[in-house]
């Protein structure tokens, strides 16, 4: 499945959703600057981590253990004995950001093909075996990484680690299997993007907002690129990027770290080491004026979406850019981080309301440049221009008047509550740790980020509202509704869209 980061996941509970940020299925800002940060794909995020001898478990955060195998693969273990279940996730630091022009969608296509067999197992056999063990499995592809998971009774962990390691090392399939699965992926694109006006609006807005950054391309790929993609293209992509030094295995649940390390050495440790390809910087050039686009499509209501280029979090150092990224995250929560927040009160409530629904998101983390998003669905009798003006007026109000300390404390309290809630889920813990690894952050980033966010001041939020919301860094997209008459009936989802 494709997974475009929901920016709100980062803004509201910080890591409540782990995508984003975590950049399942094609969520987008309805969602995934005067000052502007141009970022390139991070070439070696692990450079932030201290060197570690191979095959040695080290406690790197509260209850979190990490080891590096001889072949370069990273192992992360988070014991949680509250229920007899275990989650294994395989994270590969490759997503659509690593694709080249003409090959969009190849990372996602490879995700699908990873379920199509190995030298020993036929198509779909891995999932069937996981189900027989009483578990479930799936995968997702984002702009920044690809991840595979199995959730099983803890006693079945050895079997699923062996299955996933076999797939990682020995994935193979015939050309006719690729042809069948490509038809499934194209239908996925039609159903989730081409037939969904808001998804098309988001896709076109990203393509307009980013000129050089690989975020210009959709994770699922342009249809023309899918048409020309070959089985050998996908095999070559896998050979380049699916190497141990570009991957991490995260295991969370009712497990013993030393036993998991022994299993990892037995299963993943035998995979030969290979070099990770170099990544060329592709910085986004400075934007020098507003960009606007309209999408005319059959729809019941208009949609107005505004995105502004903003700095993303680059590590945890106290830099001006990182401070601004955190302040923008707080700003998004002030605008739309709880029931009855500023945007809802100003635009949705009351007899003179401008919108039926609103949204504010900040892209806190990612391997590429980030966006702050404002969205509104105009109310009956209101125009997109009125909705846009109302959205921008609320940001301008904060830039002019600031934010009260009590309001900030309210959203910060919600972040802490979100952190506590997240820890009840073994899957969420595994997803959070894997995403931190993939984005080059330390594995104790949640506690450090909460500490940093709690220190954000009203003055910093006001300064961010003043700094990043000018016309010259904005890309505005409007869905202009067309008649629903003669619109084709939505088609049922075909079999095979699980991945």
Q: For each predicted feature, which ranges?
A:
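C-terminal motif of bacterial Sec signal peptides marking the signal peptidase cleavage site
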Residues: 21-24
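Bacterial signal peptide processing site
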Residues: 26-28
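Post-signal peptide N-terminal segment of mature Sec-exported envelope proteins
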Residues: 30-65
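An aromatic/glycine/proline-enriched structural segment found at the starts
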Residues: 48-50, 211, 219, 243, ...
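Mature N-terminal segment immediately following signal peptide/propeptide cleavage
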Residues: 52-92, 96
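M16 family metallopeptidases and their MPP-like homologs
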Residues: 78, 83-109, 123-167, 197-224, ...
């Amino acid at each position: 499945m494709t997974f475009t980061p929901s920016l709100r996941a980062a803004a509201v509970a910080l890591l409540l959703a782990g995508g984003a940020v975590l950049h399942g299925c094609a969520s987008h800002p309805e969602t995934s600057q005067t000052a502007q940060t141009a970022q390139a794909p991070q070439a070696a995020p692990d450079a932030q981590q201290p060197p570690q001898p191979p095959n040695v478990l080290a406690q790197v955060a509260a209850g979190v253990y990490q080891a590096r195998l001889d072949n370069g693969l990273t192992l992360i273990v988070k014991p949680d004995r509250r229920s007899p279940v275990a989650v294994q996730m395989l994270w590969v630091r490759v997503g659509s950001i690593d694709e080249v022009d003409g090959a969009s969608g190849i990372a996602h296509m490879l995700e699908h093909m990873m379920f199509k067999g190995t030298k020993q197992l036929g198509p779909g056999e891995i999932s069937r075996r996981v189900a027989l063990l009483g578990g479930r499995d799936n995968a997702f592809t984002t702009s920044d990484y690809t991840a595979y998971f199995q959730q099983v009774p803890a006693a079945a962990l050895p079997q699923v680690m062996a299955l996933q390691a076999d797939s990682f090392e020995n994935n193979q399939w015939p050309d006719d299997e690729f042809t069948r699965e490509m038809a499934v992926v194209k239908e996925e694109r039609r159903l989730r993007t081409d037939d969904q006006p808001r998804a098309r609006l988001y896709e076109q807005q990203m393509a307009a907002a980013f000129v050089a950054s690989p975020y210009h391309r959709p994770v699922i790929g342009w249809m023309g690129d899918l048409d020309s993609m070959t089985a050998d293209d996908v095999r070559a992509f896998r050979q380049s990027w699916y190497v141990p030094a570009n991957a991490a295995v995260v295991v969370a649940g009712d497990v013993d770290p030393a036993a998991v390390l022994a299993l990892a050495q037995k299963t993943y440790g035998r995979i030969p080491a290979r070099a990770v390809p170099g990544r060329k910087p592709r910085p986004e050039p400075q934007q020098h004026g507003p960009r606007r686009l309209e999408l005319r499509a059959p729809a019941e209501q208009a949609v107005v979406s505004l995105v502004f280029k903003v700095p993303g979090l680059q590590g945890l150092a106290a830099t001006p850019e990182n401070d601004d990224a955190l302040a923008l995250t707080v700003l998004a929560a002030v605008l739309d981080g709880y029931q009855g927040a500023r945007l809802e009160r100003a635009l949705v409530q009351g007899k003179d309301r401008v919108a039926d629904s609103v949204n504010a998101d900040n892209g806190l983390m990612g391997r590429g440049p980030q966006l702050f998003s404002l969205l509104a669905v105009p109310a009956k009798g209101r125009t997109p221009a009125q909705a846009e003006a109302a959205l921008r007026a609320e940001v301008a109000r904060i830039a002019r008047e600031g934010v009260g300390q009590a309001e900030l404390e309210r959203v910060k309290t919600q972040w802490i509550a979100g952190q506590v809630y997240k820890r009840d889920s073994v899957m969420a813990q595994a997803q959070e740790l894997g995403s931190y690894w993939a984005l080059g952050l330390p594995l104790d980033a949640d506690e450090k980020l909460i500490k940093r966010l709690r220190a954000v001041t009203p003055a910093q939020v006001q300064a961010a509202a003043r700094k990043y919301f000018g016309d010259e860094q904005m890309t505005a997209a409007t869905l202009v509704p067309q008649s629903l008459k003669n619109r084709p009936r939505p088609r049922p989802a075909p079999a095979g869209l699980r991945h």
